[in-house]
UniProtKB/Swiss-Prot annotation:
Localization: Nucleus
The protein's name in its UniProt record: APC/C activator protein CDC20
Role summary: Activator protein that regulates the ubiquitin ligase activity and substrate specificity of the anaphase promoting complex/cyclosome (APC/C). At the metaphase-to-anaphase transition, recognizes and binds proteins containing a D-box including the B-type cyclins CLB2 and CLB5, HSL1 and securin PDS1, and recruits them in a C-box-dependent manner to the APC/C for ubiquitination and subsequent proteolysis. Required for sister chromatid separation and disassembly of the mitotic spindle.
Source organism of this protein record: Saccharomyces cerevisiae (strain ATCC 204508 / S288c) (Baker's yeast)
Domain of life per record: Eukaryota
One GO BP annotation of this record: regulation of mitotic cell cycle
Biased composition (Low complexity): 43-56
Bias-annotated ranges (Polar residues): 599-610
Domain notes: The KEN box is required for the association with the APC/C complex. The C-box is required for the association with the APC/C complex.
Positions of short motif Bipartite nuclear localization signal: 85-101
Assigned keywords, A-Z: Cell cycle, Cell division, Mitosis, Nucleus, Phosphoprotein, Repeat, Ubl conjugation, WD repeat
Length: 610
């Protein structure tokens, strides 16, 4: 195809497609996508008669049809031959010979124990064809007593750790996860009903030692108990309840020119409900409240590799392919500053912390930039050997999590600029990183195509506290919550993962049980590259290689789960004077809010230098 006609075709396609326009929910914008037009065609040729096809030894005269005529094969009128069963006489002689040969070789190679000088099994019995059951009976009768042989220690006790091995296979439906957990809870309930301890052996050959008094036992347990052993004491988990989520997207927007690259972060959603998306060399802003679309900038010759909103939601940082990072003011739609890394490679990941911005490059360096000073690079960390494709600051700013193409997760101490922990558990690139909002010390990381796992880390001890096998590539992770009416309206901690092949699904897991509670199968035609959670924490925006931006309602609105103890405390406070406590809380909140606002700059010119 000549280049001129190809350019005209591309121009025609781009002319018919408007950026971030509402696509039809029924057609899912299949015809307008280049990927679907090239990969989604299914061509089926009808069976035609060729000149080389001749029917011989037929009673009918030869067919002299043209090459373009459709040929239909005649049906076979002769009945199919009868099938030969395996137990028929045809296989009987051969089967008996093999059986006798195997029995003789097994008996000749087996040696039996003896008592004194007499053999337990006589040689005459070995010469006769006997079965294994007869041999076992002779051995039992000749021996003086029967001693059971324990094949393993785990055979005679119920180990809670082995119960997790009964998890369903990856990519299993939420119903399969519910059935697996039902079996686990059933085993635990049976053990409790029978009066058996989960770590107690069933067969015991010695009597139990005398028990001490209850007071002495409690004091001993309190002395030996530590924080970690106390955390490991788990109650019988309640059965998970499958959640019903809408598998159809609430809105579909067209995103022509989106880069199908797993290592890039091209989507960001601000707290002011403005979604920023990078389409090739241009950056667009979509207001989720009004639906307005605006073009912020178009670099024409430079590709955008990462996009992230600042903490004040008034500025946005753009990582480019040439190694530079630009900061734009959204209100004035103008460029504020350009920060040059000097590396000459693309900036694929960004993370803000007040006036500091961390940039991850393709060469493996992490640069900490201070936007208030002229020499913006204040620190450079070069511990990764591959591209840094994931960065995320902790809420308190004391730690920074990074994931790279070297299959490594690192947790950095921002005060010493040194990595506290370096984890190489993943077997693929780590892009998805997310800090837990309920337990700030818990970090979730997701691996790529060959890893397919989600690992949970304790950022204080560096220990891995849980894992989930998703069965697909993990491109993003987001924490959410749901509320159940069966458990008194308590909050369920959940995490949503977006993936790629084979199902391009959105999966929701319960953090406590690690079971899948909901999923959206085939959410996109291609793999999901990026996703962002809305400011209210309910809607998930996903974009994939099919050049479609979709919005799914996943979580319930964010609110703090109240327990029964909180209700009792509120009642007690009401007796001693609830109004006084409320006034004190309001004063403390006003002081904290004033301190927070005083720390942030009031205008752009105070901390941004051109």
């Amino acid at each position: 195809m000549p280049e001129s006609s190809r350019d005209k075709g591309n121009a025609a396609i781009s002319g018919n497609r408007s950026v971030l326009s509402i696509a039809s929910p029924t057609k899912l914008n299949i015809l307008s996508s280049d990927w679907s037009r090239n990969q989604g065609k299914v061509s089926k040729n009808s069976l035609k008669r060729s000149s080389s096809l001749n029917i011989r030894n037929s009673k009918r005269p030869s067919l002299q049809a043209s090459a373009n005529s459709i040929y239909s094969r005649p049906k076979i009128t002769i009945g199919a031959p009868p099938l030969i069963r395996r137990d028929s006489s045809f296989f009987k002689d051969e089967f008996d010979a093999k059986k006798d040969k195997a029995t003789f070789s097994a008996y000749s190679s087996r040696s039996y124990p003896t008592i004194g000088s007499e053999s337990v099994v006589s040689q005459t019995s070995l010469s006769q064809p006997t079965t294994s059951r007869e041999v076992d009976e002779q051995f039992t009768v000749a021996a003086d007593r029967y001693i059971p042989i324990l094949q393993g220690a785990s055979q005679n006790k119920v180990d809670p750790e082995t119960l997790h091995e009964a998890l369903p296979p990856p990519n299993a439906s939420p119903i399969s996860h519910l059935r697996a957990q039902t079996k686990i809870v059933f085993k635990q309930n049976v053990a409790e009903a029978c009066g058996l301890d989960m770590n107690k052996r069933i067969l015991q050959y010695m009597p139990e030692p005398p028990k001490c008094s209850s007071l002495r036992q409690k004091s001993y347990i309190m002395k030996k108990r530590t924080h970690y052993s106390y955390q490991q004491e788990q109650k019988i988990p309640d059965l998970i309840k499958l959640r019903k989520i809408n598998t159809n997207p609430e809105r579909i927007l067209d995103a022509p020119g989106f880069q199908d690259d797993f290592y890039l972060n091209l989507l960001s959603w601000s707290k002011k409900n403005v979604l920023a998306i990078a389409l090739d060399t241009a950056l667009y802003l979509w207001n989720a409240t009004t639906g307005d679309v605006s073009l912020l900038t178009d670099f024409e010759n430079t590709t955008i590799c990462s996009v992230t909103w600042s903490d004040d939601d008034c500025h946005i940082s753009i990582g480019k392919e040439d190694g530079n990072t630009e900061i734009w003011d959204v209100e004035t739609m103008s460029l504020i500053r350009t920060m040059r890394s000097g590396l000459g490679v693309r900036i694929g990941s960004l993370s803000w912390l007040d006036t500091l911005i961390a940039t991850g490059s393709r060469s493996g360096e992490i640069q900490i930039n201070d936007v208030r000073i002229k020499q913006h690079i204040v620190s450079t960390w070069a511990e990764h050997t591959g591209e840094v494709c994931g960065l995320s600051y902790k809420s308190d700013g004391l730690q920074l999590a990074s994931g790279g193409n070297d299959n490594t997760v690192m947790i950095w101490d921002t005060r010493t600029s040194l990595p506290q922990f370096s984890k190489k558990t993943h077997t693929a690139a780590v892009k998805a990183l997310s800090w837990c909002p309920y337990s700030p010390n818990i970090l979730a990381s997701g691996g790529g195509q060959t890893d397919k796992h989600i690992h949970f880390w304790n950022s204080i001890t560096g220990a891995r506290v849980g894992s989930i096998n998703t069965g697909s590539q993990v491109s993003s992770l987001h924490w959410g919550q749901s509320h159940t009416s069966t458990n008194g309206g308590m909050m369920n901690k959940e995490i949503v993962a977006t993936g790629g092949n084979p199902e391009n699904a959105i999966s929701v897991y319960n953090y406590e049980t690690k079971f899948k509670v909901a999923e959206v199968v085939h959410a996109h035609e291609a793999r999901i590259c990026c996703s962002q959670l809305s400011p209210d924490g309910t809607t998930l925006a996903t974009v994939g290689g099919d050049e479609n931006l979709k919005f799914y309602k996943i979580f319930d609105p964010r609110c703090t789960g109240r327990s029964r103890e909180d209700g009792l405390m509120d009642g007690m406070l009401g007796l001693i004077g609830k109004e006084g406590c409320r006034t004190n809380d309001k004063e403390n909140r006003s002081k904290n809010s004033s301190e927070i606002h005083t720390r942030r700059p009031s205008s752009t010119s105070q901390y941004l230098i051109r």
